């Protein structure tokens, strides 16, 4: 994920993955899966279910994802902004020193 290209879906899924939050995934068919998100890309999710089996689920088949607890997915945005600001300040300091 590029630093300047953060989107809500990636922030949400990545925070669920990093915190290993249990989720219930509701599929369009009405089926429900419970487990932990292990990874994702633009089109799929890998979920480890309660019986320790991994399933690859296509995002277009998902209706919604319900986390078992609230998550702070905006923390990634704030961390990214702090890192970008620090990097810019460091670059500015280096540019001033070289003059």
UniProtKB/Swiss-Prot annotation:
GO terms for molecular function: RNA binding. CDD domains: Hfq (cd01716). It comes from the Bacteria. GO terms for biological process: regulation of DNA-templated transcription; regulation of RNA stability; regulation of translation, ncRNA-mediated. One of its GO terms (cellular component) is cytosol. Keywords: RNA-binding, Stress response. SUPFAM superfamilies: Sm-like ribonucleoproteins. Residues 77-99 are annotated as: Disordered. Residues 10-71 form the Sm domain. Belongs to the Hfq family. NCBIfam families: Hfq (TIGR02383), PRK00395.1 (NF001602). RNA chaperone that binds small regulatory RNA (sRNAs) and mRNAs to facilitate mRNA translational regulation in response to envelope stress, environmental stress and changes in metabolite concentrations. Also binds with high specificity to tRNAs. Homohexamer. PANTHER family: RNA-BINDING PROTEIN HFQ (PTHR34772:SF1). This is RNA-binding protein Hfq.
